[in-house]
């Protein structure tokens, strides 16, 4: 599934170069502890090894994926002495597929790893600890993913079409017969997809496939050459059998074969329907997404006489539920097409107390028209880069309460430093288990303005 293992950035150190370890070499290692990304850490012959699929205290044989300087990245090939925490991998493709990098850890241990990662970032970078730790926000550990991207590639030497997910540490494609983290309605589509694609007349012109599950099922095919009528019939019949929409992505933007069809998802607690298109960002975990929105509103506590600001609003995932509680919601997003989509979603849900604006939120906030007389509360849901320029000006907007939803604890911790400088205190924080079986951490933090306007480096009043 989705890959969350990130490559390391190396800097030249000068001096004589140590001989590099060749890719593919196998080495027996003793794993001392876990890194924040879930990989095992070992030390051998002056080098630090980061080993996928290994746990603290284990003896493993690892295969080198890449090396530079004193850092080696590797993957577990064999476990000689297993940790008592290790469980059998729930997926038959474990160790080959590049997704689900911590599925060998029980779910409660995965949560502990993510909690530790968030706490360490806040402590190390911001010197802060929340006054209260919220319980992890969780859902089912399997069958949660409502969107998936399937790699498709023509092997000209073998004269065959490869269909599956990217392998761990390489661009190879691993054939996948089933994926335990996909929602159940997508499983039969996933299983039968390779056979259908191999029936098409120009397999070398096929790109990736995306699967969607929401208010309806959908299959999107990226193709680099026009499809024949026979191929189009095969695709239509496949989607009709699975009761799924068919979307095609040739030149230009993806389009449904049936113009009347659209993609969307429902937020049941607020009876809201949000439409989106392929390429738009949505949270892949529907259950945790709805619980996240509910928790954000519970923490922010918007009232019927308050003006609330939603930054990085996307499709309106937070803005529309906020509009059910607040007097007015001003929502800002960097991409104009998403602004238009959010405004259309508000209109289709008969919400008229929302205003949507486009602004580059990576730049310092200026006297934008949407600021007006300020806001009682602010919600932020930035991308991985965080919201540094935005948080530098939030105190000037008069907000007493801030909820920060983060997909990167490192930038959340960095931005926490700035918020504390402005007189906010870190009231509450917790993890959101949006991606079970991976080490990817989502988090939510509540900041409140100190009554006397003073700040404390610990985040406490």
Swiss-Prot record:
CDD domains in the record: AdoMet_MTases
Occurrences of domain TRAM (ranges): 20-78
GO process annotations (BP): rRNA base methylation
Positions that bind S-adenosyl-L-methionine: 283, 312, 317, 333, 360, 381
Sorted UniProt keywords: 4Fe-4S, Iron, Iron-sulfur, Metal-binding, Methyltransferase, rRNA processing, S-adenosyl-L-methionine, Transferase
Catalytic activity, as annotated: uridine(1939) in 23S rRNA + S-adenosyl-L-methionine = 5-methyluridine(1939) in 23S rRNA + S-adenosyl-L-homocysteine + H(+)
Enzyme Commission number, as recorded: 2.1.1.190
Binding residues annotated for [4Fe-4S] cluster, in chain numbering: 91, 97, 100, 179
PANTHER family, per database record: 23S RRNA (URACIL(1939)-C(5))-METHYLTRANSFERASE RLMD, RNA M5U METHYLTRANSFERASE
Function as written in the Swiss-Prot or TrEMBL entry: Catalyzes the formation of 5-methyl-uridine at position 1939 (m5U1939) in 23S rRNA.
Name of the protein this chain belongs to: 23S rRNA (uracil(1939)-C(5))-methyltransferase RlmD
Natural source organism: Pseudomonas fluorescens (strain Pf0-1)
Gene designation: rlmD
């Amino acid at each position: 599934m989705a890959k969350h293992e990130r490559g390391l950035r190396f800097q030249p150190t000068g001096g004589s170069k140590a001989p590099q370890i060749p890719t593919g070499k196998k080495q027996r290692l003793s794993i001392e502890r876990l890194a924040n990304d879930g990989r095992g850490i070992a030390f051998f012959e002056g080098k630090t090894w980061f080993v996928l699929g290994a746990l603290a205290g284990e003896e493993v044989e690892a295969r080198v994926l890449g090396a530079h300087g004193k850092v080696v990245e590797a993957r577990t090939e064999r476990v000689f002495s297993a940790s008592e925490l290790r469980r059998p991998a729930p997926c038959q493709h474990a160790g080959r597929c590049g997704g689900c990098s911590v599925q060998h850890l029980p779910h409660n241990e995965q949560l502990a790893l993510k909690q530790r990662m968030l706490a360490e970032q806040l402590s190390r970078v911001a010197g802060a600890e929340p006054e209260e730790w919220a319980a992890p926000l969780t859902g089912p550990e399997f069958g949660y993913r409502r969107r998936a991207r399937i790699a498709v590639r023509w092997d000209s030497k073998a004269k065959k079409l490869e269909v599956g997910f990217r392998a761990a540490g390489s661009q190879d494609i691993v054939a996948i017969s089933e994926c335990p983290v996909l929602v159940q309605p997508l499983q039969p589509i996933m299983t039968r997809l390779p056979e259908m694609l191999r029936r098409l007349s120009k397999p070398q012109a096929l790109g990736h496939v995306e699967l969607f599950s929401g208010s309806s099922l959908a299959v999107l095919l990226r193709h680099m050459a026009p499809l024949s009528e026979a191929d189009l019939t095969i695709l239509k019949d496949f989607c009709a059998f699975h009761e799924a929409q068919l979307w095609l992505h040739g030149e230009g933007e993806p389009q449904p074969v049936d113009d009347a069809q659209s993609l969307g998802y429902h937020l049941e607690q607020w009876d809201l329907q949000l439409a989106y298109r392929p390429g738009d960002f949505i949270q892949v975990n529907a259950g945790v997404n709805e619980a996240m929105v509910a928790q954000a509103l519970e923490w922010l506590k918007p009232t019927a006489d308050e003006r609330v600001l939603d930054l990085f609003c996307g499709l309106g995932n937070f803005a529309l539920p906020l509009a059910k509680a607040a007097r007015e919601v001003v929502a800002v997003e960097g991409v104009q097409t998403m602004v238009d989509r959010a405004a259309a979603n508000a209109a289709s849900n008969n919400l008229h107390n929302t205003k949507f604006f486009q602004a580059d939120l990576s730049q310092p906030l200026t006297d934008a028209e949407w600021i007006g007389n300020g806001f009682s509360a602010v919600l932020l849901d930035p991308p991985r880069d965080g919201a540094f320029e935005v948080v530098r000006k939030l105190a000037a907007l008069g907000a007493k309460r801030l909820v920060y939803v983060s997909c990167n604890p490192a930038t959340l911790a960095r931005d926490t430093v700035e918020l504390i400088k402005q007189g906010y205190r870190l009231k509450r924080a917790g993890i959101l288990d949006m991606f079970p079986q991976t080490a990817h951490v989502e988090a939510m933090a509540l900041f409140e303005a100190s009554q006397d306007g003073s700040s404390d480096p610990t985040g406490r009043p």
